[in-house]
Amino acid sequence: MKDFSNFLGLGIAGNFALHLDQAGEAEDFKDIITEDEAAPKGMFPFYLPCKTESASKRPRPILSTYPLSSQKIQLPREQVNVQAEPEVGLVCDIEYKDGLIAKITPTHFGAYNDCSIREAGREKISDKKNWGQNSKGIAQQLLDIDKFTQGGIMDAYAICSFLRRDGKLHAYGEDVELNGYSYFYEKLTDWIINQINTQKDFGPLEDIKSYIKACNY
């Protein structure tokens, strides 16, 4: 697996219909209002490639611990429920202009496990997303993206997931085509650019732009 320790690790909350309800996170986002009812609720950091120093308790220091693994998921030391969250992961190039993100170009994709702590009441969504090394799963080999638009390679792929227990495979969730995301392709990258540039510290969300600046990205 390629080392992504110099990359920013960001996730999207609520880009599938009813996903937040299924993940037990709908209550966390009850006060987040979006212009488009189908739009994702926001973004969260799961890995920051620097050690940030802040007068506040955010971002949490644990976010500077590299969490990705293609071999295993290490459960938290604390006694909490953990759930697998099958997703597609994107590797992207980012261009900046005047201190803001101006362009995002997805270059590779692969299976991704946005493994999360399932526990209500955590202050920020990122509090559930990184508890140390090996807390996120990613494919051993990623695939090249020919074009991040309809008609490209990603049209032919879907997300499916299985859990192995006692030597038996069990289907986990429903098979969903990648273009089944509420926002995808240009609609998604446009939304990400705007969200990172404008998202405030509110409710379960954090000021990601300030984190990026602190990491000199």
Task: Annotate the PLM regions.
Residues M1-D3:
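A short acidic-Thr-Gly-centered motif at the start of a beta-strand
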Residues K213-Y217:
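Conserved catalytic-core subdomain
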Residues S5-I212:
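Glycine-enriched loop-and-adjacent helix/strand subsegments that border the catalytic/binding cleft
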